[in-house]
Amino acid sequence: MEKKFKLIYKDKEIKLVFNLNVMQAIQEEYGTIEKWGSLTDGESGEVDIKALKFGFTAMANEAIDIDNDDNGTDEPFFTTKKAGRIISDLGFDKVVMAINETVINSTKDDSEKNA
């Protein structure tokens, strides 16, 4: 379930991870993953910027935390302000697509295993 999606920002790789830790953070903030998803997918109107920044920050910080654990590094975590600057520079469409792909690719194997 821990598949990483990668974005390039200012010649640096940003990884996004959607796992149980990220799911828990989203549920604590938005109640359900489905509710958060409807706020960030843009299908029913304007993308909720706070929800987008929250999800992006949670996914990026989880990837940083995993890399820090795996590699013995101490890469700093993103703030929501930094996430906002990155999202603005990369563009909403690109980031929304990256978040959606991360969620879909991280969860599709689980449903196949349970079938």
What do these predicted regions represent?
Residues 1-8, 28-44, 68-115:
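Charged interaction scaffolds used for protein-protein
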Residues 25:
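Short active-site loop/helix that positions an aromatic residue
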Residues 16:
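Active-site-adjacent beta-strand anchor residues
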